[in-house]
Amino acid sequence: MIPPRALLLISVWMVSGGRTLLVTVQDTQRYTMLFSSIILKCDYSTSAQIQDVAVTWRFKSFCKDPIFDYYSAAYQASLSLNQDPANDCNDNQREVRIVIQKRGQNEPVLGVDYRQRKITIQNKADLVISEVMWWDHGVYFCSVEAQGDTSGDPDKEVKLVVLHWLTVLFIILGALFLFLLIGICWCQCCPHCCCCYVRCPCCPTRCCCPEEALARHNYMKQMESMTPWMLDRPYYAGADRNSQHSSYQLNPLLQRDLSLQSSLPMPAPMSFSPPNNKVLDFLETEIKNLNTAQPLMSAPHYGGASHHPSMLSSLSEVGVREVDRRVIQLPPLVEHIVSSHRSSNSSHQRRNMGSWDPLDGERDRRRNRQLDDSLSNETNWRAQERQHSDRSSGHRRDPPNNRRPRRDVSPPRRYGDSYSDESANNDPRGRSNPHSDRARPTERRRSPERGDQGRRGSPDRYSRSQRHRRSYSPPHRRDSWSSEDETRNNQRGRGRRERSYEWPEEKPPSYKSLEICAGKAPTQRPGAVRQSDRASSRSGRSMVI
């Protein structure tokens, strides 16, 4: 039999155990952004009737901010002591607000501070915040009250962390990106100030530095800079592309996308003075003064060795002989002709030595009359010179009384040496002088120790004097030709004139008259005219320009 006291204790335990209240939450901590929506889950279990249950959501601010104060020394010390520094503080140290309340099946009622907010309770006790604000950052407590349930855990907490600082940062970055995007789109759509190569989403077909628009713009800039060099009449930017004065006819890119409906007159070109080029002016003046009516004589074609090369052909043998040449005939040269060729040379000379100048005709006839007398004296003088040279065996100086004065019938020449040694072997009529080969010197320049011997009548001196009288070219020496050489040559020629026949005048024949041979070539006998293969245009017969 159970005592009555035991039965009382059992009945009290059963009654108290069956009416216990239990509140649960799904997440104890949530993170959200500003202006976002969030749902805080909360549920409860009770034996009371649903109309007797009241649900209340309260807000309490953080004691210490879990974001900004997380790395502080006090926050880390509380964590080391297994405390919650964000929530372990009295209510008088933080802000406490009632968010919303609901009893039974009635409509929820917002708190005083949340009257204008979009906040509600759904299901049993879920809190729904449609738009999270800056001050929603804190701890939310879900409390349930049921009549008759006095035991159990009537409330639970949920931490809501609002990332307001990150939102502000994102807003700032978004604004900068917006300005950057606007700037990119603006500069991409305006080719005159394009400075970037990034594709713009606002106008992908027209932007990203269009090369065609840039080419048109650059071409227009070049055309504006070239305005002074265009025609005197103003051109128009919107003219017809087939027009002669159109500025777009040179670039095909300018033929497209022309939005100008009317012609825009461009400024008139500026006048510039022509550049001062004295060389071009001089050449134009010379060309204008050129006498085109003056006939030009082409050089006659000779075959083989009988061709007389000109000065130009001697300087450049390639491609000059076929050029039309203007021949300036120089005065004939009187040479010492040996007795073996006396008759043929004298007759040929009388036929070919025509008066090249009317003023010098009398002088030429007088010179021809003296030629026969000088030939005999010249032969005797050659024999005596050869005997004296054999006797002296070194071209020593002969006594003055043993020397026979030499007659020089040729006019004095100003220049000493010729261009080449071939002129000493060939007379101006194309025949080779066999006796001049024996008298040819082995070197061009006279050595200082043999200077007196050359003046006294040695064979070398005679051959050099022959070349001196045949050439009008300057001396071919290693040193430069100066006035001292000219003075020495004049003295030498003056000494020869004292021992020769008296000339009618001191100067050689005048060169002021030029005979232009147009269409006539000098007649020569094929048998008598012959020239060596080494003959060049350096002879004294003609000068070709």
From Swiss-Prot:
GO terms for biological process: epithelial structure maintenance; protein localization to tricellular tight junction; regulation of RNA splicing; tricellular tight junction assembly. Residues 21-159 form the Ig-like V-type domain. InterPro entries: Ig-like_dom, Ig-like_dom_sf, Ig-like_domain-LISCH7, Ig-like_fold, LISCH7. Residues 373-382 have a biased composition (Polar residues). The keyword Transmembrane applies. Belongs to the immunoglobulin superfamily. LISCH7 family. Maintains epithelial barrier function by recruiting MARVELD2/tricellulin to tricellular tight junctions (tTJs). This is Immunoglobulin-like domain-containing receptor 1. It comes from Xenopus laevis. The gene is ildr1.
